[in-house]
Amino acid sequence: MIKLRLKRFGKKREASFRLVACNSTSRRDGRPLQELGFYNPRTKETRLDTEAIRERLGQGAQPTDVVRTLLERGGLIEKTIRPAETVGKAKQAAKREEEAKQAAKEAAEAKAAAEAEAAAAAEAAKAEDAPDGETESSEG
């Protein structure tokens, strides 16, 4: 399997990286199949050979996470949602759903309480009318 990954070079504590296509079993700094670009994390300088990268991606090469981020910034591939982001968003969605259920439950309880209160008021009004009428008829 061909991977698109970074090959380190430069001085100690002043690392720069070359974006290379290489076999997934080869060493990090081993001989690459093709050099595709350059990345300096200190200055954020990035140079990409877009045609060669598109060709390698078309052949089925898999970019590493860091290279994927560089390619997304360069506009060569679409931004993808990674599993860690999905988990966080899933937790947030579950929390929102739970809050919505709780709010719906509270609204249903409030509605039921209002209906019960209205029914009690209607019964009280009937009860006031009925005993008065019964007492008058029993007295008269």
From Swiss-Prot:
Transmembrane segments: none annotated. One of its GO terms (molecular function) is structural constituent of ribosome. Residues 130-140 have a biased composition (Acidic residues). InterPro entries: Ribosomal_bS16 (IPR000307), Ribosomal_bS16_CS (IPR020592), Ribosomal_bS16_dom_sf (IPR023803). The keyword Ribosomal protein applies. GO terms for cellular component: cytoplasm; small ribosomal subunit. Residues 86-140 are annotated as: Disordered. The keyword Ribonucleoprotein applies. Keywords: Ribonucleoprotein, Ribosomal protein. Residues 94-114 have a biased composition (Basic and acidic residues). Residues 115-124 have a biased composition (Low complexity). GO terms for biological process: translation. Belongs to the bacterial ribosomal protein bS16 family. This is Small ribosomal subunit protein bS16. It comes from Parasynechococcus marenigrum (strain WH8102). The lineage of its organism: Bacteria, Bacillati, Cyanobacteriota, Cyanophyceae, Synechococcales.
